[in-house]
Every structure is written in C-alpha cells, then in structure tokens.
C-alpha cells in the first residue's frame, strides 16, 4: 500500500494514464479493423481509404508511446500488402 504522498499521486496518475492509453489502443484497433473488414469484403477503394486513415492513427500511437514503432511498422506493412493484393 502506498504511504507517501508521492506514491499516492503516482497511483492516481498511473490510473489516469492507463485509461487514456486504453482508449488510444482501442481507437487504433478500430481503425485497423476497418481496413481488415474492407479487405475481407474485397472492396479495394474502401480498404485504401481506411488504410489512409489508419496509418496516422498508428503513427500517433507510436508518438504517444502506446505502441512500439516496429509493431506499428509491421502492422502497416502487412495491411498495405493485403490491400495491394486486392
């Protein structure tokens, strides 16, 4: 149990950050899912549009430290390859 005021403050701060980071990850997943759904339906135009929206969202996640840059690069590369194969 946290006893010092600093430790108590860190717990409050960590809880707030965890909530924000969870929302960011959820948002990234939603954008990625839009691309995957469009690819599954075979809609190239929608997939390209969704990919164009997902890329900056993943980059924002990298900048905020929510997702590792290599993970984002790998996901984007795989999504791009799937969209190009349509």
Curated annotation (Swiss-Prot):
Signal peptide: none annotated. Transmembrane segments: none annotated. The keyword Ribosomal protein applies. GO terms for molecular function: small ribosomal subunit rRNA binding; structural constituent of ribosome. GO terms for biological process: translation. Keywords: Ribonucleoprotein, Ribosomal protein, RNA-binding, rRNA-binding. InterPro entries: Ribosomal_bS20, Ribosomal_bS20_sf. It comes from the Bacteria. One of its GO terms (cellular component) is small ribosomal subunit. Binds directly to 16S ribosomal RNA. Belongs to the bacterial ribosomal protein bS20 family. This is Small ribosomal subunit protein bS20. It comes from Erythrobacter litoralis (strain HTCC2594). The lineage of its organism: Bacteria, Pseudomonadati, Pseudomonadota, Alphaproteobacteria, Sphingomonadales.
